[in-house]
Amino acid sequence: MFGYVIADLARLDEGQQTRYKSFYCGLCRALYRGYGPVPALALTYDMAFLTLFLSALYEPDEKSGAARCLRHPAQAQSWTQTAFTGYAAAMNCLLAYENRRDDWHDDQKLSAAAAAGLLGPGAKRAAAQYPEKAAAIRAALQTITQAEEDRTAYSEAPANAFGELMAELFAVKADRWTPVLRQFGRSLGKLIYFMDAACDLEEDRRANQYNPLALLDMQSGADFRPQLMLLAGDAAEAFERLPIVQDAALLQNILYSGVWTRFDAAFRTKQEEPT
């Protein structure tokens, strides 16, 4: 369900693209140094967005540099880190591990079991640093698994559980913005869950795999776009309530345009102009 919260690079200027990539590289650097090379390979742009988002809201000090890495051994890459980079790295590590565990549970693929084994030590360190977050992630994913075992009726329970998972990630600390951050994460999580379900609907039907939209009267996942737009609107409403100035245009690009990239590619629909 990850890989949806990405930028629409074609709509970013060169400076914004450089800024976006530097946060991604900063997160990769934190993953490698904190948890090892295998977790670094499981890096997602979703968690780079988390770093960028929290940094834009709280505006902590930044540090930056340039370095070569496993992905780019020939040329040094610019990176940016803040106080939230380590947190996002830990969440990335936990989510990657739990995702592979769930893949093993669902499909019994040896590759998933092997990946979970390699990610396990890093996830254990991340869980020791953030035990409450680790417990919340595991509980949410267990709720999703249990809800998905009932294929007899349409249910929003899995989407709600994923929404709560994302709410937990964005509520990085208790302060005046926590309720809005939880609302934002909850709405974004539900959007991601249902968007992923819409993109996978045809394939899941062929494979007789669980999909919450399979029991609805629709020919294609593209038919669910109006409902997705409502969820995207909920996330946008929460976002606009936050006093974000730094990197606001970049974040708006991701939320209002980039998040639709995979959906539009899946159904070859024309990208709507953001309002």
Regions found by a protein language model. Give the residues of each.
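Acidic catalytic motifs of isoprenoid enzymes
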Residues: 1-183, 190, 194-229, 237-247, ...
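Short, flexible loop/turn segments with low-complexity composition
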Residues: 248-252
